[in-house]
């Protein structure tokens, strides 16, 4: 079995202009990513500000991306919620629109136990019959998919991958020991750990920063066998990532998507923009990176 993708998937930011989704900017941004050879596009996830998108907006964003991508790379829709049956409905609709897979976050707020997680994910997968990427991000959900749970879920034919945003390599190593690496992919959900993630056998990344430096991030994957090369190549990227850590994602990355002309610098409440001085700091870090300064 081949994996859903190998290399860089981009967690797509949603451009806004006057608090409305800017579909012209969205199309230009997606074309930029395709022109730079990214391997997958993930829509309606955390970086997309999905909690503040309406169902209609999510569907229209997905339809726009699916049409533009035209089967050249997988389009993966974030459809997971803390309500199993709403997740099923959203996933079925994504399938109808043309998504190649869905990404399901662990239930948040109401949470559950590991037995509940298994039933939650398998109920969705078996009903929707579309490839599923599990999304483990305990920093946002206060809920972890334990390694033994990943192992159980990996036997479901529709559950094909894990996006691991734990930044915990003991967790990663245990998961990797428990799964069939030929059939189940492991993607990093943390841009700052990709070098180490690749060195330990990860299959790729679902990246935020690749919204603006897709080619550079794909280079890291393409040259992952050369540890010295990618370690050195990554050093200036680390400096840019430091600037993007000024606030919660996607607040800082949208400074740069706007800087590149993909919509205005807008986020929806409860998110608020960076202060002007912080915006300048992020832009300056990006300019220095592009100029090759370290």
Curated annotation (Swiss-Prot):
Compartment(s) where it occurs, according to its Swiss-Prot or TrEMBL record: Cytoplasm
Recorded metabolic or biological pathway in which this protein acts: Amino-acid biosynthesis; L-lysine biosynthesis via DAP pathway; (S)-tetrahydrodipicolinate from L-aspartate: step 3/4
GO BP terms: diaminopimelate biosynthetic process; lysine biosynthetic process via diaminopimelate
One Pfam family it belongs to: DHDPS
Reaction catalysed by this enzyme: L-aspartate 4-semialdehyde + pyruvate = (2S,4S)-4-hydroxy-2,3,4,5-tetrahydrodipicolinate + H2O + H(+)
Gene3D superfamilies, sorted: Aldolase class I
Residues where pyruvate binds: 47, 206
Residues flagged as site, Part of a proton relay during catalysis: 46, 109
Keywords carried by this UniProt record: Amino-acid biosynthesis, Cytoplasm, Diaminopimelate biosynthesis, Lyase, Lysine biosynthesis, Schiff base
Gene Ontology cellular component annotations, sorted alphabetically: cytosol
EC number, as in UniProt: 4.3.3.7
Matching InterPro entries: Aldolase_TIM, DapA, DapA-like, Schiff_base-form_aldolases_AS
Broad class of enzyme this protein falls into: lyase
GO molecular function: 4-hydroxy-tetrahydrodipicolinate synthase activity
Active site: 135 (proton donor/acceptor), 163 (schiff-base intermediate with substrate)
Family of the protein in this entry: Belongs to the DapA family.
Subunit and interaction comment: Homodimer.
Functional summary from the UniProt entry: Catalyzes the condensation of (S)-aspartate-beta-semialdehyde [(S)-ASA] and pyruvate to 4-hydroxy-tetrahydrodipicolinate (HTPA).
Stated name of the protein: 4-hydroxy-tetrahydrodipicolinate synthase
Organism: Staphylococcus epidermidis (strain ATCC 35984 / DSM 28319 / BCRC 17069 / CCUG 31568 / BM 3577 / RP62A)
Gene field: dapA
């Amino acid at each position: 079995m081949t994996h859903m993708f190998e290399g860089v998937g981009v967690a797509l930011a949603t451009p806004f202009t006057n608090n409305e989704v800017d579909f012209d900017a969205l199309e230009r941004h997606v074309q930029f990513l395709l022109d730079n050879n990214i391997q997958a596009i993930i829509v309606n996830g955390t970086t997309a500000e999905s909690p503040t998108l309406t169902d209609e907006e999510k569907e229209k964003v997905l339809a726009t991306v699916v049409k533009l991508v035209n089967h050249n790379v997988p389009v993966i829709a974030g459809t997971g919620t803390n309500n199993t049956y709403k997740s099923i409905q959203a996933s079925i609709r994504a399938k109808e629109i043309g998504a190649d897979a869905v990404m399901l976050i662990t239930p948040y707020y109401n949470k559950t136990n590991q037995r509940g997680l298994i039933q939650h994910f398998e109920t969705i997968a078996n009903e929707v019959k579309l490839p599923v990427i599990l999304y483990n991000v305990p920093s946002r959900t206060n809920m972890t998919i334990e390694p033994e749970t990943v192992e159980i879920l990996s036997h479901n034919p529709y559950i094909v991958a894990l996006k691991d945003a734990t930044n915990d390599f003991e967790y990663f190593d245990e998961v990797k020991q428990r799964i069939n690496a030929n059939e189940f992919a492991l993607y990093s959900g943390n841009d700052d750990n990709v070098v180490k993630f690749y060195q330990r056998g990860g299959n790729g990344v679902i990246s935020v920063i690749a919204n603006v430096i897709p080619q550079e991030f794909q280079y890291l994957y393409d040259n992952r066998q050369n540890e010295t090369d990618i370690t050195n190549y990554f050093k200036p990227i680390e400096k840019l990532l430091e600037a993007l850590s000024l606030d919660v994602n996607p607040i800082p990355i949208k400074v740069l998507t706007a800087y590149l002309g993909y919509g205005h610098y807008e986020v929806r409440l409860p998110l608020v923009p960076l202060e002007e001085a912080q915006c300048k700091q992020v832009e300056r870090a990006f300019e220095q990176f592009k100029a090759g300064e370290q």
